[in-house]
């Protein structure tokens, strides 16, 4: 996001109030677990609700008042998400994007099959009626639902326990700001943002006092809702990226 907006470290420090040395260490990856108040200051600085709204499609005259009934009447080939009554266009995922989501889902599914339990993994495209209302229907890249009553014929009714978004240039602002806010408000327990371009994973475990925790692809990333018994290995993903996968 720093690169995308064209800010220097000095500008970020001056405008956010975070010391220059701290800013440099966070964005270089030297500091893996920044203090919570530091993260809040940086998140506030980068928060762009108006720019996020620019990704709302202008094709829909009633944006802001659409419902899941309107969503259900759209053609299958028209990929959108409905968030608070607004339609957000979704580009078709790349081969790399789907490979990453598929690898994360595979490891989760294998763990659940081997260890049992009531939780069910899913992978996009699955509709999630996040707020149990008529104004929001999203399609997270990967998720886990542990309350079987939330699993419906159409998809998931209510907040999943665990969600992953693999970001792309077209979804970056939405995943970092709008969806983060929606997921925490809806009661999602854990949310991962996988930035494969930077080879980073931001882990938001909302039951913890400190988040996000930032991981690289060089070591397994623990899934907190499983008390760290499940860890996602990014070795294959890192290799694919090295081989030129996009």
What are these regions (language model features)?
Residues 54-62, 106, 110-111, 119-120, ...:
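C-terminal interaction segment
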Residues 29, 49-84:
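Polyampholytic, low-complexity intrinsically disordered segments
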Residues 61, 84-87, 92-105:
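Nuclease catalytic cores
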Residues 36-52:
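DNA major-groove recognition helix of helix-turn-helix/homeodomain DNA-binding modules
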Residues 17-34:
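Recognition helix of helix-turn-helix/homeodomain-like DNA-binding domains
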Residues 1-15:
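Short basic helix-loop element that most often maps to the first helix and adjoining turn
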Residues 79, 191-193:
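Short, surface-exposed charged micro-motifs
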């Amino acid at each position: 996001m720093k690169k995308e907006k064209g800010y220097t470290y000095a500008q970020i420090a001056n405008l956010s109030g975070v010391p220059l040395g701290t800013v440099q260490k966070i964005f270089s990856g030297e500091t893996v677990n920044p203090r919570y108040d530091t993260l809040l200051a940086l998140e506030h600085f980068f928060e762009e609700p108006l720019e996020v709204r620019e990704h709302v499609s202008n094709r829909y005259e009633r944006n802001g008042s659409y419902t899941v009934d309107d969503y259900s009447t759209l053609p299958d080939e028209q990929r959108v998400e409905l968030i608070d009554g607004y339609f957000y266009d979704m580009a078709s995922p790349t081969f790399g994007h789907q490979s990453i989501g598929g690898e994360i889902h595979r490891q989760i599914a294998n763990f659940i099959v081997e260890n049992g339990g009531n939780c069910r993994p899913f992978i996009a495209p699955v509709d999630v009626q996040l707020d149990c209302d008529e104004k929001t229907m999203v399609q997270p890249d990967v998720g886990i639902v542990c309350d079987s009553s939330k699993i419906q014929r159409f998809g998931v009714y209510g907040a999943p326990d665990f969600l992953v978004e693999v970001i792309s240039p077209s979804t970056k602002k939405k995943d970092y700001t709008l969806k983060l806010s929606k997921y925490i408000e809806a009661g999602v327990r854990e949310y991962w943002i996988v930035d494969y371009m930077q080879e980073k994973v931001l882990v938001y475990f909302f039951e913890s006092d400190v988040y996000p925790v930032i991981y690289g692809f060089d070591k397994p990333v623990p899934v907190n809702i499983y008390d760290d018994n499940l860890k996602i290995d990014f070795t294959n993903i890192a290799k694919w990226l090295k081989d030129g996968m996009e």
